């Protein structure tokens, strides 16, 4: 029975939160096409192979074709990979076919001569664990999803910032997934230029001509034509067209056939007069003789008599040209329709700049611009141009690029992944329209223009890069050798692919060491989106806009959770309900609204699809029929928040928490916190260290169970079933249904104990179930670190008082009770791993041994006979963990050694002590030792002991597994055999004992103690015997499989290890360090209220309540108002009310009140129909147990943006008998005197963060020095010193502390001889300081020497102690 929980949420959530790791797991499954019946040819790994193969040689005499691939089973399981430092990967085999052709020299036709098919080992591929991580070289890593600009087309303008005229210049860019970028932009003179791959710009019409268009074609595409007629009487007539209306002034009266004037001279044409003229059948109207002067020709004008071109298309019409056309009897003049239209003459102006005449010249010009160093020929230029945008091998828009291009340009005709002529021309038409109408530019920060590249796609791209490298090598190999004699494996070498994968998983910016501090940090890391990485932004170039919160982020990207440093806004998190669709766009779910009624139909929409929808908020009030109560509803339309009539609403949010990430959704009363503090709160929860005893928060949000369930830290039941065995080491479950058919539905879960996480925190699981318990799918079987009862539990519920206390909580410092140290409230366990390797050196092998020269017995007391520390030993800094000796080179023998050799006649062992010792700052208990030996090497006693222990564990596991299978089989057979007549009698275990006679029926009691094997052929009924036999055959097969499985595990234990070359033996020692709460530790709440422990006060000195109970923690009240995180105060009040109410209910039981009244009180407190029915259905024993669990407080759930109101909190406080202002009288623990003012007190959830003082504190007297400057090194890792910078020097100079300064800058730093003398003087007790020359001065002198300046020290005559630095130049002069 779960704990009774008070839920304050009012909004009914109709959709469960999707699995939090779906993005990672589904993406990699799609890449491998796991579970697919047939492989899709253009997806994942199959698509990569098909895109590179077939590979042909340069002469087309042979072709290497891909057939299929197969992924094998991994050699080691995940636990072995982590323990041995290996990569969790599976082998890949590909089937390829080598086809050799005979080529006819004349016709160039090919005929197949030979086909060879072969299976080839193609290296390995890292596999993803079920937790969404990769194990690379023994460490768990996460591939972070990249957020990058989507392929497609984007229209932009410079907002008038580029040119001094402040003219707005428009541009557009076509971005492919792979290939050349294409940019079109206008300059201030309205000339359209094109850039390919951001090279030198050129007139865009060159590109149009290269596509095969003539001048006339270009003009015809972009402009409409008007026609004018040159009459013999000198008049100029304008031919009417219904599409070419222009508000021009009529030159002469225009009358219809009946003489009625439609348009008067001197008056402008109206749309009505234009329509009447067309209806009257008037073909043309007269215009002024010079009307077309200044317009542009739409076509070439040719004198038909002579064939002479009088004027070319796009030429400007002049009065002289009009006269010439009349002379040549040209009647009809085609003109571009630019006058009075929205279309400018920019394309025509660009054509005039373009000096190329035809397609060939245009292509040569493009080649010359992009390849300036190589001489162009028409053929090369033509091939080059075709490859630029039209060849799928070099250019790929990708399905998403094509989708975005079609969506933006309104195209539906093509699904090609290359760029077509229609795409380019339509893009220019849209760009022209934007420029001519001053339309808005696209928003590049809109999530419709940014897409997620999940892990599957990132790995796919890397695999493709590797295969392309391999393709080059294969082609070269095919051309160098006689292909007909080769087999496919002679051509294929998978090393380039493996190298690319290794580099990506090991060193890529997106492959990160997993943050494993706690369960939340793991999940958050896998849901992170990064705009950095290859192909993304850099933090230096990223501006404010790309980092800022955008309206399209709502429900897709969390506006709160992001780092505080230089990466702010570049690294973000997915929201709780967000999904990524097949195109990589983030989608969020909405409920569909029809005719003002909210339905349960759910629609996932990306940011582009949401455009135009009217979306109501999740907290909009609904009546019983799910209709909006208010006439006007708060909605979002195109990013703006407006009040809309309820009839216009089309969608509604699913839940108030859908706009924030899981970290932010764990902050109760988030709506009352300032965003900056909420950001800190969500980030600091990820740094919380799992404590020795986890406690879930009294005030939660309801998200805790979702995070714990999906984190992978807990063990979750995969189906309904029964627990067969449970202890601290393992849980054995038999599942119903078809799960694990080879083991009869039985699965054994190993619980992890004292396992080291990536951040050295302790990863341990504890069982929640007991033997014989019936479980349901999704039940939590075992809690992980920082989890209690399947809910996230990162901190502790502490009684808090907001008051100053003697300055100890000045500036966010924290005063805490000694009870937290005594009772291990904030104690955590950290595990440190130390490794030692014995190698084969040139001077001989290193040896792990107990026999170490010049080491006393007390240092060896915890080492065993093999020189390795025993498990359970308490160690402190400088203790030996593993004894190791290394051979030394030949040295000069001392007289003593010569004497020894003369006496004993042998060389004394010449070795040095290189043992593994405990480093400074580590004090703890050895909890595990792992030894790794070469397969062929001899095993020492400790290795044999470890192996024996492991084998005994495996034997026990196998017995438990088989026992569970036997019980399951017996239960499955019970309905078949119980009540059936026996054909034979049943003998008992003891001699002469008879359980049942022949002819009796078998009872359930008899079956219980009976070995299942004895049921074979036991019954009179043939059908029963057949059913039993069938079940027993299946049982035997399953036992056989379990035996084989454990046998292979035993072999792995005893077979030895694959060690790197030159390594004889390796040992790893794990030390558990207990870190108690200490002054200097960083602590925080969930609202960004962080601080450092300044004082741990004895319990009796802490402020206390009137009944004598002391508070646990004292915080500064001044930390609240300026930070504006009022959520912490509301949490404090609700926590106090919940704690007191729970205590009150538990006391009612203890004081002997009758259960009926306690039940009624519980129902009143929870005020929930669901809880009331649950309480009514409980038997007395369960009810008493449930109420006793409330002693420490009633667990409450107050979801973000839908939590408890102030009125509800006040009501609860009144019920608990507390003042509704949340204040109480406190007494000083030191004097017993009551404080003057009442103090805000309550219960707050406090976390201990990973910044522990024990790990940061560091001291040094002497240690390593830098080789060049001879100054001490810096940092704890190098055992370095404290840096005294120039500002510190200024401070000492200001105080005139000359001797102190001299000491700091010489003997305590880089005066080599001085510090040796200093040491001698300290030993002798002489306190006189004699400073010498700092080594850094010598470094300066040497640097000056490198500039040709010789610095020497002179002694002046007549002055003994005075020294002066002088400089001697190359010509002998000095000063």
From Swiss-Prot:
SUPFAM superfamilies: beta and beta-prime subunits of DNA dependent RNA-polymerase
Statement: the UniProt record of this protein carries the keyword Ligase: no
Top-rank lineage group of the source organism: Bacteria
Reactions accelerated catalytically: RNA(n) + a ribonucleoside 5'-triphosphate = RNA(n+1) + diphosphate
Gene Ontology terms: cellular component: DNA-directed RNA polymerase complex
GO molecular function ontology, one term from the record: DNA-directed RNA polymerase activity
Pfam families listed in its UniProt record: RNA_pol_Rpb2_1, RNA_pol_Rpb2_2, RNA_pol_Rpb2_3, RNA_pol_Rpb2_45, RNA_pol_Rpb2_6, RNA_pol_Rpb2_7
Record-linked InterPro entries: DNA-dir_RNA_pol_bsu_ext_1_sf, DNA-dir_RNA_pol_bsu_external_1, DNA-dir_RNA_pol_su2, DNA-dir_RNAP_su2_dom, DNA-dir_RNAP_su2_hyb_sf, RNA_pol_bsu_bac, RNA_pol_bsu_CS, RNA_pol_bsu_protrusion
Class of this enzyme: transferase
Biological-process GO terms, alphabetical: DNA-templated transcription
EC number: 2.7.7.6
Keyword set, alphabetical order: DNA-directed RNA polymerase, Nucleotidyltransferase, Transcription, Transferase
Keyword Glycoprotein applies: no
Record text on subunit structure and interactions: The RNAP catalytic core consists of 2 alpha, 1 beta, 1 beta' and 1 omega subunit. When a sigma factor is associated with the core the holoenzyme is formed, which can initiate transcription.
Family: Belongs to the RNA polymerase beta chain family.
Functional note: DNA-dependent RNA polymerase catalyzes the transcription of DNA into RNA using the four ribonucleoside triphosphates as substrates.
Name assigned to this protein: DNA-directed RNA polymerase subunit beta
Organism field: Oleidesulfovibrio alaskensis (strain ATCC BAA-1058 / DSM 17464 / G20) (Desulfovibrio alaskensis)
Lineage: Bacteria, Pseudomonadati, Thermodesulfobacteriota, Desulfovibrionia, Desulfovibrionales
């Amino acid at each position: 029975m779960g704990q009774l929980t008070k839920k304050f949420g009012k909004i009914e959530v109709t959709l469960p939160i999707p699995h939090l790791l779906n993005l990672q797991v589904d993406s990699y499954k799609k890449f491998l096409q796991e579970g697919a019946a047939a492989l899709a040819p253009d997806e994942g790994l199959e698509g990569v192979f098909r895109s590179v193969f077939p590979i042909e040689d340069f002469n087309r005499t042979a072709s290497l074709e891909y057939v299929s691939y197969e992924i094998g089973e991994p050699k080691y399981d995940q636990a072995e990979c982590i323990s041995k430092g290996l990569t969790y990967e599976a082998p890949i085999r590909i089937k390829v076919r080598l086809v050799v052709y005979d080529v006819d020299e004349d016709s160039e036709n090919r005929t197949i001569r030979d086909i060879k098919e072969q299976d080839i080992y193609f290296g390995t591929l890292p596999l993803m664990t079920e937790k969404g991580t990769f194990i690379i070289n023994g460490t768990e890593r996460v591939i972070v999803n990249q957020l990058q600009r989507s392929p497609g087309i984007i229209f932009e303008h410079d907002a008038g910032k580029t040119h001094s005229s402040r003219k707005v210049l428009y541009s557009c860019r076509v971005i492919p997934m792979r290939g050349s970028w294409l940019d079109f932009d206008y300059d201030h003179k309205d000339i359209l230029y094109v850039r390919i791959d951001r090279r030198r710009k050129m007139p865009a019409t060159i590109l149009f001509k290269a596509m095969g268009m003539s001048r006339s074609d270009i003009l015809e595409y972009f402009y409409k034509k008007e026609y004018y007629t040159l009459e013999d009487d000198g008049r100029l007539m304008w031919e009417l067209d219904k599409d070419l209306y222009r508000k021009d002034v009529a030159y002469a009266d225009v009358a219809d056939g009946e003489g009625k004037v439609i348009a008067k001279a001197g008056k402008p044409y109206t749309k009505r007069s234009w329509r009447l003229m067309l209806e009257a059948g008037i073909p043309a109207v007269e215009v002024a003789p010079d009307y077309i002067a200044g317009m542009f020709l739409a076509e070439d004008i040719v004198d038909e008599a002579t064939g002479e071109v009088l004027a070319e298309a796009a030429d400007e019409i002049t009065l002289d040209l009009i006269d010439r056309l009349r002379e040549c009897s040209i009647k009809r003049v085609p003109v571009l329709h630019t006058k009075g239209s929205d279309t400018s003459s920019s394309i025509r102006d660009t054509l005039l700049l373009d000096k190329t005449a035809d397609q060939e010249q245009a292509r040569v010009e493009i080649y010359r611009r992009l390849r300036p160093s190589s001489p162009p020929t028409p053929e090369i230029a033509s091939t080059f141009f075709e490859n630029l945008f039209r060849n799928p091998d070099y250019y790929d828009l990708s399905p998403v690029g094509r989708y975005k291009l079609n969506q933006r340009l309104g195209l539906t005709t093509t699904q090609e992944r290359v760029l077509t002529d229609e795409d380019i021309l339509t893009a220019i038409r849209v760009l022209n329209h934007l420029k001519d109408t001053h339309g808005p530019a696209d928003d590049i920060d809109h999530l419709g223009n940014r897409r997620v590249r999940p892990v599957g796609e990132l790995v796919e791209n890397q695999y493709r890069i590797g295969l392309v490298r391999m393709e080059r090598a294969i082609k070269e190999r095919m051309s160098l050798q006689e292909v007909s004699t080769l087999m496919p494996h002679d051509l294929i070498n998978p090393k380039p692919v493996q190298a690319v994968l290794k580099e990506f998983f090991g060193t890529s910016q997106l492959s990160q060491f997993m943050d494993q501090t706690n369960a939340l940090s793991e999940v958050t890391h896998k849901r992170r989106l990064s705009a950095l990485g290859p192909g993304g932004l850099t933090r230096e170039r990223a501006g404010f806009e790309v980092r800022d919160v955008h309206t399209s982020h709502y429900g897709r990207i969390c506006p709160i959770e992001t780092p505080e440093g230089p990466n702010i806004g570049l690294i973000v998190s997915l929201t709780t309900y967000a999904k990524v669709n097949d195109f990589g766009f983030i989608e969020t779910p909405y409920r569909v609204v029809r005719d003002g009624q909210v339905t349960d139909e759910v629609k996932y929409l990306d940011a582009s699809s949401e455009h135009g929808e009217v979306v109501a908020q999740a907290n909009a009030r609904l009546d019983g029929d799910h209709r909006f109560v208010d006439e006007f509803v708060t909605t979002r339309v195109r990013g703006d928040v407006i009040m809309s009539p309820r009839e216009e609403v089309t969608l509604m949010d699913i839940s108030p928490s859908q706009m924030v990430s899981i970290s932010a959704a764990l902050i109760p009363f988030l709506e009352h916190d300032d965003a900056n503090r909420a950001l800190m709160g969500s980030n600091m929860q990820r740094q919380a260290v799992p404590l020795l005893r986890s406690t879930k928060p009294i005030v939660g949000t309801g998200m805790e169970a979702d995070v714990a369930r999906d984190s992978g830290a807990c063990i979750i039941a995969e189906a309904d079933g029964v627990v067969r065995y449970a202890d601290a080491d393992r849980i054995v479950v038999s599942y119903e249904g078809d799960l694990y058919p080879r083991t009869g539905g039985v699965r054994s879960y190993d619980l992890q104990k004292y396992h080291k996480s990536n951040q050295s925190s302790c990863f341990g699981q504890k069982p929640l179930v007991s033997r014989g318990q019936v479980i349901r799918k999704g039940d939590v079987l075992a809690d992980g670190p920082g989890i209690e009862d399947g809910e996230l539990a990162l901190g502790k519920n502490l009684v808090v008082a907001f008051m100053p206390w003697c300055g100890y909580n000045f500036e966010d410092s924290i005063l805490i009770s000694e009870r937290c140290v005594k009772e291990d409230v904030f104690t955590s366990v950290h595990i440190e791993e130390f490794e030692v390797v014995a190698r084969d050196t040139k001077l001989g092998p290193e040896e792990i041994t107990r026999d170490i020269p010049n080491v006393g017995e007390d240092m060896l007391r915890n080492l065993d006979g093999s020189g390795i520390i025993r498990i359970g030993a308490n160690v402190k800094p400088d203790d030996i963990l593993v004894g190791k000796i290394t051979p030394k080179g030949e040295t000069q023998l001392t007289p003593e050694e010569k004497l020894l050799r003369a006496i004993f006649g042998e060389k004394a062992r010449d070795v040095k002590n290189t043992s593994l010792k405990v480093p400074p700052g580590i004090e703890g208990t050895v909890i595990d030792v792992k030894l790794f030996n070469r397969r062929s090497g001899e095993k020492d006693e400790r290795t044999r002991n470890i192996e024996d222990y492991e084998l005994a564990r495996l034997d026990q596991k196998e017995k438990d597994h088989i026992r569970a299978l036997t019980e399951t089989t017996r239960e499955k057979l019970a309905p078949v055999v119980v009540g059936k007549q026996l054909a034979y009698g049943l003998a008992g275990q003891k001699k002469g004992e008879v359980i049942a006679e022949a002819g009796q029926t078998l009872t359930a009691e008899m079956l219980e103690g009976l070995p299942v094997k004895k049921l074979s052929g036991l019954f009179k009924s043939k059908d029963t015997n057949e059913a039993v036999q069938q079940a027993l055959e299946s049982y035997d097969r399953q036992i056989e499989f379990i035996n084989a499985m454990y046998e292979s595990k035993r072999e792995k234990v005893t077979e030895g290890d694959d060690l790197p070359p030159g390594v004889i033996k390796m040992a790893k020692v794990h030390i558990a360090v207990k870190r108690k709460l200490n002054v200097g530790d960083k602590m925080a709440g969930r609202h960004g209220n962080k601080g450092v422990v300044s004082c741990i006060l004895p319990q009796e000195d802490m402020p206390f309540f009137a009944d004598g109970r002391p508070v646990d923690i004292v915080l500064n009240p001044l930390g609240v108002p300026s930070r504006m995180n009022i959520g912490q105060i509301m949490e404090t009040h609700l926590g106090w009310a919940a704690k007191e109410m729970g205590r009150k209910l538990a006391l009612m039981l203890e004081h002997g009140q009758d259960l009926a009244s306690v039940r009624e009180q519980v129902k009143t407190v929870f005020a929930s129909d669901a809880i009331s029915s649950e309480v009514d259905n409980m038997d007395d024993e369960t009810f008493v147990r449930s109420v006793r669990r409330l002693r420490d407080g009633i667990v409450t759930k107050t979801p973000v943006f839908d939590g408890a109101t102030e009125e509800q909190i006040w009501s609860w406080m009144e019920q608990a008998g507390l003042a509704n202002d949340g204040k109480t009288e406190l007494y000083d623990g030191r004097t017993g005197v009551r404080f003057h003012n009442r103090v805000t007190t309550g219960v707050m959830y406090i976390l201990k963060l990973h910044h522990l003082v024990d790990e940061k504190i560091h001291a040094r007297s002497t240690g390593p020095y830098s080789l060049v400057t001879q100054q001490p090194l810096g940092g704890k890792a190098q055992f370095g010193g404290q840096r005294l910078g120039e500002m510190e020097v200024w401070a000492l100079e200001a105080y005139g502390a000359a001797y102190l300064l001299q000491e700091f800058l010489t003997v305590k730093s880089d005066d080599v001889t001085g510090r040796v003398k200093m040491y001698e003087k300290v030993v002798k007790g002489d306190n006189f300081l004699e400073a010498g020359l700092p080594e850094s001065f010598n470094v300066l002198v040497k640097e000056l020497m490198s500039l040709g300046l010789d610095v020497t020290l002179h002694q002046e005559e007549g002055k003994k102690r005075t020294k002066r630095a002088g400089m001697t130049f190359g010509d002998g002069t000095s000063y």
